[in-house]
A protein has these predicted regions:
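Short, conserved SAM-binding/catalytic segment
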Residues: 21, 256-266
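Core catalytic lobe of class I
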Residues: 2-254
Length: 266
């Protein structure tokens, strides 16, 4: 069991990179140094809850975007997605750090709110963004869809038009369509929070949803800031491989123990 987890990783040259065994391993080291030793285009999905830099805590220090994107863009496959959780004001900084590759956001609607100290001045906060970046259209497996036995027709609706419009000049949608698939996902994900083993731990269900959406079974997901190992747990539950880094020894050990508890006893 112990061979899955390493406290250090020796530096590797270009030749050694291709032979590195990093699948289903969490490394206790700085992620920027660690990612530099991964092969080019070796990762199917990058999923990470980066430090937001909004709490002043030691573990919440911002990573340098230039160095982070240099490694992310080198190791992600051409059809891979980079999915990063965030909340304002960090979201604006994150999107501005790579505007050409930013595509859209999901919105995690939380059942637990924050911001009570400022409740008389601003609304309580119950949403975090999940920002999606990619070079080329990635794997996309929409979750929760229903496939019908027979196609249904969706008629284009006539609407008033004036000035610029996304509709045709005659005021109608482009055309009627037939489909066998309904209930495509919307941007808002209502998933309950988890009281976890890390101050900012995300729900396993949220990460499972993202992993199943942007990867296929057997592919590999990298989390550069593993925390308590939620990404690894979600990968195991989803039939995907994981790899990643956590520099804090206590959180690293928590992640290791969490993953071990899910693996069959030899």
């Amino acid at each position: 069991m112990a061979e899955r987890f390493f406290h250090t990783l020796e530096r590797a040259g270009p030749t050694e990179r291709s032979r590195m065994d990093y699948t289903n391993k969490i490394f206790n080291m700085d992620c920027l140094s660690g990612m530099s030793m991964y092969p080019d285009k070796s990762i199917d999905l990058i999923l990470c809850d980066l430090p937001y830099g909004i709490t002043g805590c030691r573990w919440d220090s911002l990573l340098p975007f230039d160095e982070l994107w240099k490694q992310y863009l080198r190791i992600i496959k051409d059809n891979g997605a980079i999915v990063l959780t965030s909340c304002q004001p960090f979201t604006t900084k994150l999107i501005s750090s790579q505007p050409k590759l930013f595509r859209y956001c999901w919105y995690w609607y939380k059942n637990m709110v924050t911001g009570f100290a400022n409740a008389k001045k601003q609304p309580l906060r119950c949403v975090e963004e999940v920002c999606v970046f990619y070079k080329h259209p990635p794997t996309y497996n929409p979750q929760g869809i229903i496939v019908l036995d027979k196609p249904v027709k969706r008629r284009g609706k006539s609407v008033p038009t004036h000035g610029d419009s996304v509709y045709r000049i005659d005021g109608s949608l482009a055309h009627d369509t037939e489909t066998c698939v309904v209930h495509y996902p919307r941007q808002v994900l209502e998933i309950k929070c988890e009281r976890g083993l890390h101050p900012t731990q995300k729900p396993v269900a949220l990460f499972e949803y993202i992993i199943r959406t942007y990867t296929n079974p057997g592919e590999i997901v990298l989390d550069s800031c593993m925390g308590s190992g939620t990404t690894a747990v979600a990968c195991i539950n989803s039939g995907r491989n994981y790899t990643g880094f956590e520099w804090d020894k206590q959180h690293f050990q928590t992640a290791v123990e969490r993953v071990k508890s899910l693996l069959p006893t030899p």
